[in-house]
Amino acid sequence: MAALYACTKCHQRFPFEALSQGQQLCKECRIAHPVVKCTYCRTEYQQESKTNTICKKCAQNVQLYGTPKPCQYCNIIAAFIGNKCQRCTNSEKKYGPPYSCEQCKQQCAFDRKDDRKKVDGKLLCWLCTLSYKRVLQKTKEQRKHLSSSSRGSHQEKEQYSRLSGGSHYNSQKTLSTSSIQNEIPKKKSKFESITTNGDSFSPDLALDSPGTDHFVIIAQLKEEVATLKKMLHQKDQMILEKEKKITELKADFQYQESQTRAKMNQMEKTHKEVTEQLQAKNRELLKQAAALSKSKKSEKSGTITSP
């Protein structure tokens, strides 16, 4: 009896071939709890429910620090503290300032000073490295599948040739060699068309045309999204600066207006006081003039009556 192994989720026992690599999950658990990417940090995690779109670490950070902002280096929405995500912050402390990624052209690739850490001699960021490894794994699986299927078909041909005889085997051999020769130029043309674009990583990946095409399209779309995000960020900064200037001008205008009104009120008050003082002085002078005229009249009347 073959040995059985436990699923890491439901703990039921299955043959080793029925469990997934790495996670060691059965088919039902793989369907119920698929491995998805976190909306914020873009790391792969096992989804517990359909509504849960972020990993446990990001969920804890959201509760502690609130909704994250895009990282100023990699543009991943995972900057919970400051303007940089934790991965870029740690990499900057360890390896220094970032360089431009040779695939997505963003300023988020950190040079580890080790050629073995590079991908085909290229300095790539974290996301592009993961995408490359995914494409490489897919290519290996497809090649393995093709080699196993070709091995099985070869064994079937040998069995069929033993049963049918030598003449039929020779005809089958000529047909198979002609079909292989027809397939070779097709693969060559695919390889040439991919390598002329200059977007593939290596000649080995060029044979896997669907994966590399998807990878190139995804990389181009990421580059466009990154440039649009940068443009949007620049526009937002310009709008914020203009709004700041407008508020400063409004505040200055209000201050100048209040100062002018205060000066006008003060001048009006002083003018009123001066006017009142002059009017009072004028009344006093009029009284003095009237008193003088009366005294003069009385003196004249006294001089007339005295003889």
Swiss-Prot record:
Record field: compositional bias (Polar residues): 161-182
Database matches in InterPro entries: FAM76
GO annotation, cellular component aspect: nucleoplasm
Highest taxon in the source lineage: Eukaryota
Pfam families (alphabetical): FAM76
Residue stretches in coiled coil: 217-299
Keywords: Coiled coil
Region Disordered: start-end pairs: 141-195, 285-307
Matching PANTHER family: LD21662P (PTHR46176), PROTEIN FAM76A (PTHR46176:SF2)
Family: Belongs to the FAM76 family.
Protein name stated in the entry: Protein FAM76A
Organism name: Mus musculus
